[in-house]
C-alpha cells in the first residue's frame, strides 16, 4: 500500500488553483524530492498531507486513510516556518514531544543533540537560526513515523549545516518509512534522493527515479531541473 496517495487532487484559494488534478503515489522506503520553483504548490501539497488544509476536489490518503487524528500519529511534519516557543529549552521541548507523541524516541533525540554539542538547557530565544532549525529537525526525525514531511529543511542555513541536516535525515529515518523533502535547492539534496517529483503551477510535470533521469537524460537531477524549468 502506498504511504501517500493523491487521486485527482485539487486545491483552490478563491479562483487560484494551488494544486490542479494531482495524482501520485509514494511508496515506503524512499526519500523523495518534491521539487519546483516558489509558488509551484509544494507547501500546499504538504499541508494537505498533514491535514492542515482540506481538498477542494479529489482525495489524499495517508496509509490508506484520509488525513485526520489517525494519520497524525504516523506523520512527522517539519514546517518551513519556525514554531518553537522562545521560552522553552531543548529539554522542555523533548518533554513536550515525549508527552504528545507515543512514537517519540527520546534516546535518539539526545544522541543527536550530543553529536552536535547542543545544550539541552539552552532556551530557544538564545539560539541562532541554524541551531533552532537543527533542534526542530531533531525533534521531527526522532519520531518513529511512517511518513516524514519536510518543508524546506535546508533553507536559510549555511552549507555545513545543510550537510548535517541531510546526514541526520538519512541516518535517522525508519527504512520502512518514506521521506518527502520539499526544496528548491536541488544540488544540495540530490545525493540523498531516490525519487523526484517536479511540480509547476500546481501540476505534476514528472515523477521519476533519480537513477533513471541520470541514465536516460545523461545529466544530474539539478541539471535536468534547470532544463525543464528554464525561462
Task: Identify the function of each model-found stretch.
Residues 162-175:
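Helical segment within the ABC ATPase nucleotide-binding domain
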Residues 57-71:
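Conserved ABC transporter NBD signature motif
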Residues 50:
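Helix-to-loop junction immediately C-terminal to a conserved catalytic motif
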Residues 80-135:
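ABC-family P-loop ATPase nucleotide-binding domains
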Residues 148-152, 157:
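Catalytic Walker B motif of ABC-type/P-loop ATPase nucleotide-binding domains
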Residues 35-37:
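The feature captures the beta-strand-to-loop junction immediately N-terminal to the Walker
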Amino acid at each position: 500500500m502506498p504511504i501517500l496517495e493523491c487521486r485527482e487532487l485539487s486545491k483552490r484559494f478563491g479562483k487560484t488553483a494551488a494544486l490542479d488534478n494531482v495524482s501520485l503515489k509514494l511508496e515506503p522506503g524512499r526519500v523523495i524530492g518534491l521539487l519546483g520553483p516558489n509558488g509551484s504548490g509544494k507547501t500546499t501539497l504538504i499541508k494537505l498531507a498533514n491535514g492542515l488544509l482540506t481538498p477542494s476536489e479529489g482525495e489524499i490518503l495517508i496509509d490508506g486513510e484520509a488525513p485526520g487524528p489517525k494519520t497524525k500519529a504516523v506523520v512527522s511534519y517539519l514546517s518551513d516556518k519556525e514554531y518553537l516557543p522562545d521560552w522553552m529549552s531543548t529539554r522542555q521541548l523533548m518533554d513536550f514531544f515525549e508527552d504528545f507523541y507515543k512514537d517519540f524516541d527520546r534516546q535518539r533525540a539526545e544522541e543527536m543533540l550530543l553529536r552536535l554539542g547542543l545544550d539541552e538547557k539552552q532556551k530557544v530565544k538564545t539560539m541562532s537560526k541554524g541551531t533552532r532549525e537543527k533542534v526542530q529537525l531533531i525533534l521531527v526525525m526522532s519520531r518513529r513515523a511512517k511518513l516524514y514531511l519536510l518543508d524546506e529543511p535546508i533553507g536559510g542555513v549555511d552549507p555545513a549545516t545543510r550537510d548535517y541536516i541531510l546526514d541526520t535525515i538519512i541516518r535517522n529515518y525508519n527504512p520502512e518509512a518514506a521521506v518527502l523533502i520539499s526544496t528548491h535547492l536541488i544540488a544540495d539534496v540530490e545525493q540523498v534522493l531516490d525519487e523526484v517529483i517536479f511540480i509547476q503551477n500546481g501540476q505534476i510535470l514528472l515523477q521519476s527515479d533519480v537513477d533513471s533521469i541520470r541514465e536516460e537524460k545523461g545529466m544530474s537531477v539539478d541539471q535536468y531541473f534547470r532544463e525543464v524549468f528554464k525561462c
